[in-house]
Amino acid sequence: MSASILEDVAVVPQKAVLVQGTIRDNILYGTDDILPDDELFCILNSLGLIKEDCGEHFLAFLDRDINPLGSGLSGGEIQRLCIARALARKKKIIVLDEPTASIGEELAIKIITYIRQHCPTVIITTHNPRILELADHFFDGMSKSCVIAGEGRDQ
């Protein structure tokens, strides 16, 4: 795979990777871009990490220190921070490995719908049939060769 293709890809692994620093540091880790707070707010709100009416608490949330283990955060919050990092990179392709395993189903659907609206190509590995319903195409690994084209819903 050429280096130029990899420059267009953001990956969210199944096992989340965090760095020592603030939540903002973790979201912007690996990017040279500085996202304005309003863009960060939109991403975090869409991922259910902050509420629309959080006001000044938003900046306190961004400045909150966390460690690489994500102490004080739930597994779902850690996973959503990693998704926020991928979205903040503004890549053409996002690859997500079981991105919603630690997230409730309704929020997971909302998150995948948001990702699809903001990224041209989304590749997801999942065992969740509700997430598969959102796909334009999916590959059934059990049959080992069957590519199934679906009708991705515009939500």
Features from the language model and the residues they span:
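Primarily ABC-family ATPase nucleotide-binding module
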Residues: 1-3, 42, 57, 117-118
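Alpha-helix boundary/capping and short turn/kink residues
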Residues: 17, 32-34, 105
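ABC ATPase nucleotide-binding domain
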Residues: 2-9, 20-21
